Design a protein with these regions (language model features):
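Bulky hydrophobic segments
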Residues: 1-103, 124-167
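Alpha-helical transmembrane segments that form the membrane-embedded catalytic/substrate-binding core
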Residues: 103-129
Protein backbone atom coordinates (compact mmCIF):
# COMPACT_ATOMS: atom_id res chain seq x y z
CA UNK A 1 0.00 0.00 0.00
CA UNK A 2 2.73 2.48 0.98
CA UNK A 3 4.60 1.72 -2.23
CA UNK A 4 1.63 2.69 -4.39
CA UNK A 5 0.82 5.79 -2.32
CA UNK A 6 4.41 7.02 -2.54
CA UNK A 7 4.55 6.40 -6.29
CA UNK A 8 1.22 8.20 -6.79
CA UNK A 9 2.39 11.13 -4.65
CA UNK A 10 5.68 11.55 -6.54
CA UNK A 11 3.95 11.11 -9.90
CA UNK A 12 1.48 13.85 -8.93
CA UNK A 13 4.41 16.17 -8.20
CA UNK A 14 5.92 15.30 -11.58
CA UNK A 15 2.64 15.97 -13.41
CA UNK A 16 2.19 19.28 -11.58
CA UNK A 17 5.71 20.47 -12.37
CA UNK A 18 5.61 19.47 -16.03
CA UNK A 19 2.07 20.17 -17.17
CA UNK A 20 0.24 22.29 -14.60
CA UNK A 21 2.55 25.29 -14.07
CA UNK A 22 0.13 27.64 -15.91
CA UNK A 23 -2.34 27.10 -13.08
CA UNK A 24 -0.28 27.81 -9.96
CA UNK A 25 2.94 29.42 -8.84
CA UNK A 26 5.54 28.88 -6.14
CA UNK A 27 6.94 32.24 -5.21
CA UNK A 28 8.52 33.80 -8.25
CA UNK A 29 10.12 30.69 -9.76
CA UNK A 30 8.02 31.13 -12.90
CA UNK A 31 5.19 33.25 -14.23
CA UNK A 32 2.09 31.10 -14.80
CA UNK A 33 1.04 33.25 -17.76
CA UNK A 34 4.33 32.42 -19.53
CA UNK A 35 3.84 28.66 -19.23
CA UNK A 36 1.13 28.34 -21.89
CA UNK A 37 3.23 27.43 -24.89
CA UNK A 38 3.34 24.86 -27.65
CA UNK A 39 6.86 24.16 -28.83
CA UNK A 40 8.15 20.96 -30.42
CA UNK A 41 11.88 20.23 -30.39
CA UNK A 42 12.94 17.10 -32.26
CA UNK A 43 16.68 17.72 -32.56
CA UNK A 44 18.58 15.94 -29.77
CA UNK A 45 21.06 18.02 -27.77
CA UNK A 46 20.06 21.25 -29.57
CA UNK A 47 20.49 23.14 -26.28
CA UNK A 48 24.25 23.08 -26.87
CA UNK A 49 23.87 25.21 -30.01
CA UNK A 50 22.99 28.21 -27.82
CA UNK A 51 26.59 28.91 -26.87
CA UNK A 52 26.18 28.44 -23.12
CA UNK A 53 27.07 25.23 -21.32
CA UNK A 54 25.12 26.10 -18.17
CA UNK A 55 21.64 25.96 -19.73
CA UNK A 56 22.03 22.49 -21.24
CA UNK A 57 23.76 21.14 -18.14
CA UNK A 58 21.00 22.46 -15.89
CA UNK A 59 18.29 21.17 -18.24
CA UNK A 60 19.74 17.69 -18.74
CA UNK A 61 20.84 17.15 -15.14
CA UNK A 62 17.51 18.46 -13.88
CA UNK A 63 15.47 16.14 -16.07
CA UNK A 64 17.63 13.19 -15.07
CA UNK A 65 17.42 13.99 -11.35
CA UNK A 66 13.67 14.59 -11.58
CA UNK A 67 13.04 10.99 -12.70
CA UNK A 68 15.47 9.24 -10.33
CA UNK A 69 12.90 9.06 -7.47
CA UNK A 70 10.36 7.71 -9.95
CA UNK A 71 12.83 4.98 -10.91
CA UNK A 72 13.49 4.14 -7.25
CA UNK A 73 9.78 3.85 -6.51
CA UNK A 74 8.81 1.88 -9.62
CA UNK A 75 11.70 -0.54 -9.09
CA UNK A 76 10.57 -1.10 -5.51
CA UNK A 77 7.26 -2.33 -6.96
CA UNK A 78 8.28 -4.33 -10.02
CA UNK A 79 11.91 -5.31 -9.20
CA UNK A 80 12.95 -4.98 -12.86
CA UNK A 81 15.36 -2.37 -14.22
CA UNK A 82 14.05 -2.85 -17.78
CA UNK A 83 10.40 -2.48 -16.75
CA UNK A 84 11.27 0.57 -14.68
CA UNK A 85 13.05 2.20 -17.63
CA UNK A 86 10.03 1.40 -19.81
CA UNK A 87 7.70 2.99 -17.25
CA UNK A 88 9.96 6.05 -17.11
CA UNK A 89 9.91 6.31 -20.90
CA UNK A 90 6.13 5.84 -20.95
CA UNK A 91 5.39 8.47 -18.32
CA UNK A 92 7.78 10.90 -19.95
CA UNK A 93 6.14 10.33 -23.33
CA UNK A 94 2.67 10.94 -21.86
CA UNK A 95 3.86 14.16 -20.20
CA UNK A 96 5.54 15.42 -23.38
CA UNK A 97 2.47 14.64 -25.52
CA UNK A 98 0.21 16.41 -23.00
CA UNK A 99 2.48 19.44 -22.99
CA UNK A 100 2.18 19.69 -26.76
CA UNK A 101 -1.50 18.75 -27.10
CA UNK A 102 -2.69 21.20 -24.46
CA UNK A 103 -0.06 23.94 -25.04
CA UNK A 104 1.41 23.47 -21.57
CA UNK A 105 5.11 23.80 -22.32
CA UNK A 106 7.99 22.65 -24.47
CA UNK A 107 7.91 19.17 -25.93
CA UNK A 108 11.53 18.15 -26.28
CA UNK A 109 13.17 14.89 -27.36
CA UNK A 110 15.92 15.59 -24.83
CA UNK A 111 13.36 15.50 -22.03
CA UNK A 112 12.28 12.04 -23.14
CA UNK A 113 15.89 10.83 -23.26
CA UNK A 114 17.04 12.27 -19.94
CA UNK A 115 13.82 11.45 -18.07
CA UNK A 116 14.22 7.82 -19.16
CA UNK A 117 17.87 7.92 -18.10
CA UNK A 118 16.80 9.23 -14.69
CA UNK A 119 14.32 6.36 -14.22
CA UNK A 120 17.04 3.91 -15.27
CA UNK A 121 19.53 5.40 -12.79
CA UNK A 122 16.90 5.30 -10.04
CA UNK A 123 16.18 1.64 -10.75
CA UNK A 124 19.87 0.74 -10.84
CA UNK A 125 20.45 2.58 -7.57
CA UNK A 126 17.46 0.88 -5.91
CA UNK A 127 18.73 -2.50 -7.10
CA UNK A 128 22.23 -1.74 -5.84
CA UNK A 129 21.01 -0.57 -2.41
CA UNK A 130 18.56 -3.43 -1.98
CA UNK A 131 15.15 -3.86 -0.44
CA UNK A 132 16.14 -2.62 3.01
CA UNK A 133 16.04 0.98 1.70
CA UNK A 134 12.71 0.71 -0.15
CA UNK A 135 10.77 2.12 2.85
CA UNK A 136 13.20 5.06 2.98
CA UNK A 137 12.57 5.94 -0.69
CA UNK A 138 8.82 5.65 -0.15
CA UNK A 139 8.73 7.92 2.91
CA UNK A 140 11.06 10.44 1.26
CA UNK A 141 8.73 10.60 -1.76
CA UNK A 142 5.72 11.18 0.48
CA UNK A 143 7.60 13.85 2.45
CA UNK A 144 8.72 15.59 -0.77
CA UNK A 145 5.15 15.55 -2.08
CA UNK A 146 3.89 17.03 1.21
CA UNK A 147 6.49 19.82 1.07
CA UNK A 148 5.53 20.48 -2.55
CA UNK A 149 1.86 20.71 -1.58
CA UNK A 150 2.68 23.25 1.15
CA UNK A 151 4.69 25.30 -1.36
CA UNK A 152 1.77 25.26 -3.81
CA UNK A 153 -0.67 26.31 -1.08
CA UNK A 154 1.61 29.17 -0.02
CA UNK A 155 2.16 29.94 -3.71
CA UNK A 156 2.44 33.63 -4.50
CA UNK A 157 3.00 34.59 -0.85
CA UNK A 158 6.53 33.21 -1.08
CA UNK A 159 9.40 35.43 -2.10
CA UNK A 160 10.01 39.13 -2.47
CA UNK A 161 8.75 40.63 -5.75
CA UNK A 162 11.24 43.49 -5.39
CA UNK A 163 14.14 41.03 -5.45
CA UNK A 164 13.10 39.46 -8.76
CA UNK A 165 15.34 40.27 -11.70
CA UNK A 166 14.12 39.55 -15.23
CA UNK A 167 16.87 38.19 -17.44
Amino acid sequence: MLSRVSLAAWTAVMVALTTLKPFYQIGYLWKPENQRARDLRWVPFDEFSGGSWFGPLFEYAGNTAFFIPFGLLVFSLCRSVKKTAAWGFGLSLVLEVCQYAFALGRTDIDDLLFNTLGALIGAAFARLCGERLFPVWRWLAIAAAAVFLVLVILGPRLGDPNAVVDL
